[in-house]
């Protein structure tokens, strides 16, 4: 899958797993509808809602040169009751 980079496992995202919500970092150019389509197609689940926020890039310094990393988007995907993403269910326990 090109759009989704990886699943996020923070305290908040692990707490949201109990509410059937999964958190992913995605490429910043993708929209909510594109990610919803990809998740439904790839995992075979029904998505109820998609929330997103853009996280800023971090500053990096190499000697006198100041740069930054790319910003990225984090999506919180809510599934219909009865559906789950099997690869991420192990983190729930």
UniProtKB/Swiss-Prot annotation:
The gene is rpl23-B. GO terms for biological process: translation. It is found in: Plastid, Chloroplast. It comes from the Eukaryota. Keywords: Chloroplast, Plastid, Ribonucleoprotein, Ribosomal protein, RNA-binding, rRNA-binding. InterPro entries: Nucleotide-bd_a/b_plait_sf, Ribosomal_uL23-like, Ribosomal_uL23/eL15/eS24_sf, Ribosomal_uL23_CS. Belongs to the universal ribosomal protein uL23 family. GO terms for molecular function: rRNA binding; structural constituent of ribosome. GO terms for cellular component: chloroplast; ribonucleoprotein complex; ribosome. It comes from Agrostis stolonifera (Creeping bentgrass). Part of the 50S ribosomal subunit. SUPFAM superfamilies: Ribosomal proteins S24e, L23 and L15e. Pfam families: Ribosomal_L23. Binds to 23S rRNA. This is Large ribosomal subunit protein uL23cy.
């Amino acid at each position: 899958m090109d759009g989704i980079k990886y699943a996020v496992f923070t305290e908040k995202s692990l707490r949201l797993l109990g509410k059937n919500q999964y958190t992913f970092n995605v490429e910043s150019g993708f929209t909510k509808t594109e990610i919803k389509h990809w998740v439904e197609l790839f995992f075979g689940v029904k998505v109820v809602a998609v929330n997103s926020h853009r996280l800023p890039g971090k500053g990096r310094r190499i000697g006198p040169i100041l740069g930054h990393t790319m910003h990225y988007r984090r999506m919180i995907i809510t599934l219909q009751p009865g559906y789950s993403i099997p690869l991420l269910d192990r983190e729930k326990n």
